[in-house]
C-alpha cells in the first residue's frame, strides 16, 4: 500500500486534495475569470484614458495582478503565496472600497458610480462586479484555512 493511500497509519501524511475537483476548482475558475476581467479592464483604461484617473487605473491594474497571482497560487497549491496574495486582496478591497465611498477624490474618481468610467475593480467594494471582489477573498481564506486544518496544501 502506498503512503498516499494509507490514511489509517498514525503520523502518515494526509492525502493532498485533488486540484482538479470540488471547491478548489471552482475557486480557481472564479479567480481566473476575475483576473482576466480586472486585467483587461485596467489595460483598456490605461491605454484609453490614463490621464483621467491614474491612481484608480493603477489600482485596477494592481488588482488584476493580484488576481493573476492568486489564481496561479491556488491552482499550483502554493498555499503560503495564496494566503499572502488573498490577504492583500482583502485589504485592498476594504481600503479602496471605503475610500471610493468616503473620499473618492483621493483615488481620482469623479463619481461614486461603481460602473462609472473611472471606477476601479474594487470601487464600492466591487459593486460593479456584483461584490465578487469582496466575497471572493473571504471564501479563499476560508478555503485555505480549512485545508490547513487537515494538512492540505491547497
Question: What is each PLM-predicted segment?
Answer:
Residues 72-99:
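Loop-to-transmembrane helix junctions at the membrane interface
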